[in-house]
Amino acid sequence: MTWFIDRRLNGKNKSMVNRQRFLRRYKAQIKQSISEAINKRSVTDVDSGESVSIPTEDISEPMFHQGRGGLRHRVHPGNDHFVQNDRIERPQGGGGGSGSGQGQASQDGEGQDEFVFQISKDEYLDLLFEDLALPNLKQNQQRQLTEYKTHRAGYTANGVPANISVVRSLQNSLARRTAMTAGKRRELHALEENLAIISNSEPAQLLEEERLRKEIAELRAKIERVPFIDTFDLRYKNYEKRPDPSSQAVMFCLMDVSGSMDQSTKDMAKRFYILLYLFLSRTYKNVEVVYIRHHTQAKEVDEHEFFYSQETGGTIVSSALKLMDEVVKERYNPAQWNIYAAQASDGDNWADDSPLCHEILAKKLLPVVRYYSYIEITRRAHQTLWREYEHLQSTFDNFAMQHIRDQDDIYPVFRELFHKQNATAKD
């Protein structure tokens, strides 16, 4: 029976290299198409693949051709309509020939539609979250947080059969057999040459010829006795565990669900948090997410209740900040955790509560968090909460504010808040 072992890196997908090259070449156009498509999706359909369209003119490539003008004589095979000196009418262009779907109808003209292709979920998320990172992330060197990763570390002479390296073992076998038989093969070659000379010489030298044949047979037997493979030749893939200090982080998601937040505003907040959740879960292994919903009272909830609960009420933002402070003190030591927070609200708050929010953030939360982002989702003018937070932004470098007016602002605001910085802080 014959066995075929496919060791090609892209054996099951032969065009993967070409596909990756295409994605790298037209990354700017693909990312632009993704940023336009993200806002057209449903709230729960953010992590599937995507059909990407690129204008045809963007993927055109340079080509060599003859210059315009001059006199040229050509013979076109299959021509049965024209003879020399006939004038060929130029095709008429029309509004329907652009191919982009944006022009007016026309009875003539032609063009090309935009180039459309499908990208996978992984490719979509890689492009969606490219160049994004949690700001000010620090490596917490704690014994209980140190993980170990297995890495290749060359080859070893001992190991289990599952880790045997066939190629390296055969290379060693060939080297050993070559070294052990090289001298004998040279001697065998010399004896065979002498035997050929004696066999063709006159008069015949039967005794010498018999002696040479006997020595040749002995040398061949010695060469054949060298084993093809020996335990000395076997090599096994070696693996070692290396310490990999982990950066563990916790993200607090605070969402206003008061009566002033209409359904469209809540949907935009949900879209932002779903993007944030996908980004965190895809980028970092050790990230916990704490969901807090608030109206007049704040409550820590699970993921499903955070996104789909219908509970509503008045607005006291400080209740969420107080609850976050309690959770931090109870479960997340700032010396061991990188603490992040993202707050989404329409900016409507009880007037006397906004100064209290300023005080809680300035004295309790901002000194212990790595990064705090506030997203205000409204088409109205900013109110007291925004103005109080503006004072914090001018004082604390780890506090950021952004304004979302409609769905088209969600993804640009998300990238602005979590764009990768030039350097990551280290302890």
From Swiss-Prot:
Ranges where the record places region Disordered: 79-110
Feature: compositional bias, Gly residues: 92-102
Source species: Escherichia coli O139:H28 (strain E24377A / ETEC)
Protein's UniProt name: UPF0229 protein YeaH
Biased composition (Basic and acidic residues): 79-90
HAMAP family named in the record: UPF0229 (MF_01232)
Gene, per the UniProt record: yeaH
PANTHER family for this protein: UPF0229 PROTEIN YEAH
Pfam families reported in the protein's UniProt record: DUF444 (PF04285)
Family to which this protein belongs: Belongs to the UPF0229 family.
